[in-house]
């Protein structure tokens, strides 16, 4: 007689890990591209300030 509990635990772990990977990937991409856009805006503003100044 085999117990169903190990199968349930295994399937739940696989499901939890899958959900964590999906949510982690989405959050990671959002953070990466959000931070890159912020740095790019800061860089553009920085150089625009120097372009307006007379040297």
UniProtKB/Swiss-Prot annotation:
Q: Which UniProt keywords apply?
A: Membrane, Mitochondrion, Mitochondrion inner membrane, Translocase, Transmembrane, Transmembrane helix
- Pfam families in the cross-refs: COX6C
Question: Which InterPro entries did the record assign?
Answer: Cox7e/7s, Cytochrome_c_oxidase_VIc/VIIs, Cytochrome_c_oxidase_VIc_sf
Question: Which residues are listed as membrane-spanning?
Answer: 13-35
Q: Name one GO biological process term.
A: response to hypoxia
Q: Which GO terms describe its cellular component?
A: mitochondrial inner membrane
Reactions catalysed, semicolon-separated, are:
4 Fe(II)-[cytochrome c] + O2 + 8 H(+)(in) = 4 Fe(III)-[cytochrome c] + 2 H2O + 4 H(+)(out)
Recorded E.C. number(s)? 7.1.1.9
In the record, what terms sit under GO molecular function? cytochrome-c oxidase activity
* Localization of this protein: Mitochondrion inner membrane
This chain's function reads: This protein is one of the nuclear-coded polypeptide chains of cytochrome c oxidase, the terminal oxidase in mitochondrial electron transport.
Quaternary data: Slime mold cytochrome c oxidase consists of at least seven different polypeptides species, subunits I, II, III, IV, V, VI, and VIIe/s in order of MW.
Indicate what this protein is called per its UniProt record: Cytochrome c oxidase subunit 7s
Q: Which organism is it from?
A: Dictyostelium discoideum
Gene name, Swiss-Prot/TrEMBL: cxgS
